[in-house]
Amino acid sequence: MAGGGGKSVAAALAMACFLLILAAFAPPAAAAPPDIMSIIRYNAEHGVRGLERTEAEARAAYDLWLARHRRGGGGGSRNGFIGEHERRFRVFWDNLKFVDAHNARADERGGFRLGMNRFADLTNGEFRATYLGTTPAGRGRRVGEAYRHDGVEALPDSVDWRDKGAVVAPVKNQGQCGSCWAFSAVAAVEGINKIVTGELVSLSEQELVECARNGQNSGCNGGIMDDAFAFIARNGGLDTEEDYPYTAMDGKCNLAKRSRKVVSIDGFEDVPENDELSLQKAVAHQPVSVAIDAGGREFQLYDSGVFTGRCGTNLDHGVVAVGYGTDAATGAAYWTVRNSWGPDWGENGYIRMERNVTARTGKCGIAMMASYPIKKGPNPKPSPPSPAPSPPQQCDRYSKCPAGTTCCCNYGIRNHCIVWGCCPVEGATCCKDHSTCCPKEYPVCNAKARTCSKSKNSPYNIRTPAAMARSVPEQPDSISFVVLNREDLV
């Protein structure tokens, strides 16, 4: 992106993101006891009076946690190795002590709370090494002036785009794929589309994963939201999630679905960096894609409240700011941030992050690399339905060739064809050697010279005939065939 009025970002984001492998192993809701959270969350009997859970209590909590987060319950292990179950329990117990101690302090002083979520049997080092990405060299940004805060205009005290129906519910889950950048961009586009057109349409993250390989985007191996917006604008729109569903893995771009442009944008701009007031102004008008440092232990185990925990500015995760406000109980200003780890992380898939901090970068770097899609007009008209496929070519009563090919006789007696072949082009001329054919644009076939030409004496625009494949008999057990590629016509 070309620069636009501000200094270049020191480090652009290449989100390898959180690959939520554990999401695939969640059991049905009935598998978890109804009182599980009363056991695995902080209990006033522990921590406040300096007591620690006994090993038996910790194992009971771990068994309940396994029933909720791992298929197979207490006898299972993350990787199936001998001794891994015990090792995972020890990590879980250490995290449980950390959560108990933190929540005891939170109860005394007020503050955000932690919980034993799906990451509770990972050390923070494992969490960071397995699920977090890197930060490559930066590049220019397309900084817009529309939301630059001049310190004069009044902004609403609070905004929540969920209340205005501009976010898809429930929170989506990126699963075991580093596609947070795609989820962030899609959520921002879904929001602006609702604001402009009045329609809330769930859009396809998978199209971005498979088709948006521009810039720094690399499917499940990470990407950045600006490049996702650039792809959507250049492509003329994005397909729906229903038509192009998410698979949590890389794949080949489906060109037919890529051409179904249901929701479009006109472009994108970047919020002036390191300026929370400009970010606030932007979020007051629409959901905004932001990048954050999500690698801290407290972030890993976040459960509820306004997050004021330790974090840096190593931008490694893409999320969406969908609002801001002030906590009624504590008076803490916060950002409402939509994650892509499903609805069972944090506050139904959201985290409230501290706002108006001393650092210009914002909490966890939230003000460093924010961007938003631009949309001014209606969406593209629905594409006409694809034409029905042509029927197979019937050569005779017993043989046929696929649609888009031509029946040519391979072997015959007098005027009766015994064996049919299929020329790999439609409307072709069958050559007299009974084994090759010429396209209709070059109908003159010289089998001996192996040429196709436009006229009998033309020395120009000569092509080589294509070889034919055997036709399909009506009795499929007798003969099989493969149609040769059009590349035979060179």
From Swiss-Prot:
<dbReference type="Pfam" id="PF08246">
    <property type="entry name" value="Inhibitor_I29"/>
</dbReference>
<dbReference type="InterPro" id="IPR000169">
    <property type="entry name" value="Pept_cys_AS"/>
</dbReference>
<keyword id="KW-1015">Disulfide bond</keyword>
<keyword id="KW-0325">Glycoprotein</keyword>
<comment type="function">
    <text>Cysteine protease that may play a role in pollen development. May be regulated by the transcription factor UDT1 in developing anthers and play a role in tapetum development. Positively regulated by the transcription factor TDR in developing anthers and may play a role in tapetum programmed cell death (PCD).</text>
</comment>
<dbReference type="InterPro" id="IPR013201">
    <property type="entry name" value="Prot_inhib_I29"/>
</dbReference>
<dbReference type="GO" id="GO:0009555">
    <property type="term" value="P:pollen development"/>
</dbReference>
<feature type="disulfide bond">
    <location>
        <begin position="395"/>
        <end position="407"/>
    </location>
</feature>
<dbReference type="InterPro" id="IPR037277">
    <property type="entry name" value="Granulin_sf"/>
</dbReference>
<feature type="propeptide" description="Activation peptide">
    <location>
        <begin position="32"/>
        <end position="154"/>
    </location>
</feature>
<dbReference type="Pfam" id="PF00112">
    <property type="entry name" value="Peptidase_C1"/>
</dbReference>
<protein>
    <recommendedName>
        <fullName>Cysteine protease 1</fullName>
        <ecNumber>3.4.22.-</ecNumber>
    </recommendedName>
</protein>
<dbReference type="InterPro" id="IPR025660">
    <property type="entry name" value="Pept_his_AS"/>
</dbReference>
<feature type="disulfide bond">
    <location>
        <begin position="177"/>
        <end position="220"/>
    </location>
</feature>
<dbReference type="InterPro" id="IPR039417">
    <property type="entry name" value="Peptidase_C1A_papain-like"/>
</dbReference>
<dbReference type="InterPro" id="IPR000668">
    <property type="entry name" value="Peptidase_C1A_C"/>
</dbReference>
<dbReference type="GO" id="GO:0005615">
    <property type="term" value="C:extracellular space"/>
</dbReference>
<keyword id="KW-0378">Hydrolase</keyword>
<feature type="glycosylation site" description="N-linked (GlcNAc...) asparagine">
    <location>
        <position position="356"/>
    </location>
</feature>
<keyword id="KW-0788">Thiol protease</keyword>
<dbReference type="GO" id="GO:0009908">
    <property type="term" value="P:flower development"/>
</dbReference>
<dbReference type="InterPro" id="IPR025661">
    <property type="entry name" value="Pept_asp_AS"/>
</dbReference>
<feature type="disulfide bond">
    <location>
        <begin position="401"/>
        <end position="422"/>
    </location>
</feature>
<feature type="disulfide bond">
    <location>
        <begin position="211"/>
        <end position="253"/>
    </location>
</feature>
<comment type="similarity">
    <text>Belongs to the peptidase C1 family.</text>
</comment>
<dbReference type="GO" id="GO:0004197">
    <property type="term" value="F:cysteine-type endopeptidase activity"/>
</dbReference>
<feature type="disulfide bond">
    <location>
        <begin position="311"/>
        <end position="364"/>
    </location>
</feature>
<dbReference type="InterPro" id="IPR013128">
    <property type="entry name" value="Peptidase_C1A"/>
</dbReference>
<dbReference type="InterPro" id="IPR038765">
    <property type="entry name" value="Papain-like_cys_pep_sf"/>
</dbReference>
<keyword id="KW-0865">Zymogen</keyword>
<feature type="propeptide" description="Removed in mature form">
    <location>
        <begin position="379"/>
        <end position="490"/>
    </location>
</feature>
<dbReference type="Pfam" id="PF00396">
    <property type="entry name" value="Granulin"/>
</dbReference>
<feature type="active site">
    <location>
        <position position="339"/>
    </location>
</feature>
<dbReference type="InterPro" id="IPR000118">
    <property type="entry name" value="Granulin"/>
</dbReference>
<keyword id="KW-0732">Signal</keyword>
<dbReference type="GO" id="GO:0030154">
    <property type="term" value="P:cell differentiation"/>
</dbReference>
<keyword id="KW-0645">Protease</keyword>
<feature type="signal peptide">
    <location>
        <begin position="1"/>
        <end position="31"/>
    </location>
</feature>
<keyword id="KW-0217">Developmental protein</keyword>
<dbReference type="GO" id="GO:0051603">
    <property type="term" value="P:proteolysis involved in protein catabolic process"/>
</dbReference>
<keyword id="KW-0221">Differentiation</keyword>
<keyword id="KW-0287">Flowering</keyword>
